Design a protein with these regions (language model features):
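Glycine-rich phosphate/adenosyl-contacting loop at the front of the ribokinase-like
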Residues: 1-57
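Ribokinase/PfkB-type carbohydrate-kinase core domain
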Residues: 1-9, 70-84, 92-209
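Short active-site-proximal "capping" loops at secondary-structure junctions
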Residues: 10-12, 61-65, 265
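A glycine-rich beta-to-alpha transition motif near the start of alpha/beta enzyme domains, typified by
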Residues: 18, 53-81
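Ligand-binding loop in jelly-roll beta-barrel domains
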Residues: 89
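Conserved phosphate-binding/catalytic region of the ribokinase-like
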Residues: 181-274
C-alpha cells in the first residue's frame, strides 16, 4: 500500500523518573535519552513498520535538531520531504513516571508544511491512506486526493477551513485540546478516544458503538505515542479496506503495543505482528 503522513515532528528529550515533581520540587532521572516524537513523526514511523515504508511531508528548522530528526526518521524507513524553515525545530521535554504516564513541556512553535512549499504533493493523489496532523487548509485539500484520509481533531480549525470530507477524524474525551466538535462536511467516521477505557465511534449514516482497548503485550512502560500509534493503526486498517470495528481493533493493538515499549516507537507493531 501507498501510505503517507502530512504533519509535524519534534525532537524529544526523555527522562524516566519515579514520580513527577511537585511545584518547586526536584526529581532525579533514572534514565534519559533523545529521539523523534510529535504526532506526525510517531504516526509515520508506525505506518512504515506496518507497511512498506511511508512518505512524510513535514517542515524542519535549519538546525542540528532538524538534521537529527530527519536522520532518525529515515533510519526507520520513512521517506522524508521537509520544507526548511529559519525558525528552530520544535523540541520538548518529556518525563515518564513509574506508572508509564508522560508529562510534556514543548519548547518553541510547531513547524508544519504549507501547500506552497515545494514538496511532492502530487504523490498524495491516489495514495491508499494519508494521516494528517498539521498543515494549512490547502495542504489538507492536497491530502484529500488520497483514497483514505484520516485526521486528528487537534487541528480542528484547519479541518473546518478546508471543508473537505474526511474518512475519519480522531478526537479525545480526555484531552480538551483534542475534543471533537462538529464540522462540515461531516466526517464519515468520528472516533472519540478514552485512553485505557477504549472509546466510542459513530458514522455519518448513524451507526455507533464502543471499541475496547487492547491488552498490552507486556507491562506499560511509556504511554508517550500510544495515541499517535492508535491513529496510525486506524489509518492503516481503513486504507486496506477493514470495516470500522476491525480498523479500530488494529488501532487499539497499535496503541497498546506502543505503551509497552520504551519511547514513542520502541514497542510499535510491525507487519509480522499482524
Amino acid at each position: 500500500m501507498r501510505l503517507a503522513v502530512v504533519g509535524h515532528v519534534e525532537w524529544i528529550r526523555f527522562a524516566r523518573v519515579h514520580s513527577i515533581p511537585p511545584a518547586g520540587g526536584i526529581e532525579h532521572a533514572i534514565e534519559a535519552w533523545e529521539g523523534t516524537g510529535g504526532g506526525g513523526g510517531v504516526a509515520a514511523t508506525q505506518l512504515a513498520k506496518l507497511g512498506d515504508g511511508c512518505l512524510f511531508l513535514t517542515a524542519l528548522g535549519r538546525d542540528r535538531v532538524g538534521e537529527d530528526s530527519r536522520a532518525a526518521l529515515e533510519a526507520d524507513g520513512i521517506e522524508v520531504h521537509a520544507a526548511v524553515r529559519d525558525e528552530p525545530t520544535r523540541t520538548a521535554l518529556t518525563m515518564i513516571d513509574d506508572a508509564g504516564e508522560r508529562t510534556i513541556v514543548t519548547l518553541g512553535d510547531r513547524l508544519h508544511p504549507l501547500a506552497i512549499d515545494p514538496l511532492p504533493w502530487d504523490r498524495l493523489a491516489g495514495a491508499d491512506g494519508v494521516f494528517f496532523t498539521a498543515g494549512d487548509a490547502d495542504a489538507l485539500r492536497s491530502a484529500r486526493t488520497a483514497r483514505t484520509l484520516v485526521a486528528t481533531s487537534r487541528v480542528l480549525d484547519v479541518l473546518a477551513a478546508a471543508a473537505v470530507r474526511l474518512d475519519a477524524i480522531v478526537g479525545s474525551e480526555l484531552d480538551p485540546a483534542e475534543r471533537y466538535t462538529p464540522i462540515e462536511p461531516a466526517p464519515d467516521l468520528v472516533v472519540r478516544t478514552e485512553g485505557r477505557r477504549g472509546g466510542t465511534w459513530e458514522t455519518a449514516d448513524g451507526r455507533r458503538g464502543r471499541y475496547q482497548a487492547a491488552a498490552p503485550p507486556g507491562p506499560i512502560v511509556d504511554t508517550y505515542g500510544a495515541g499517535d500509534s492508535f491513529q496510525a493503526g486506524l489509518t492503516y486498517g481503513l486504507a486496506r479496506g477493514d470495516d470500522v470495528e476491525d480498523a479500530l481493533a488494529l488501532g487499539a493493538r497499535c496503541g497498546a503495543a506502543a505503551a509497552a515499549g520504551r519511547g514513542p516507537t520502541g514497542g510499535q507493531l510491525r507487519a509480522a505482528d499482524l
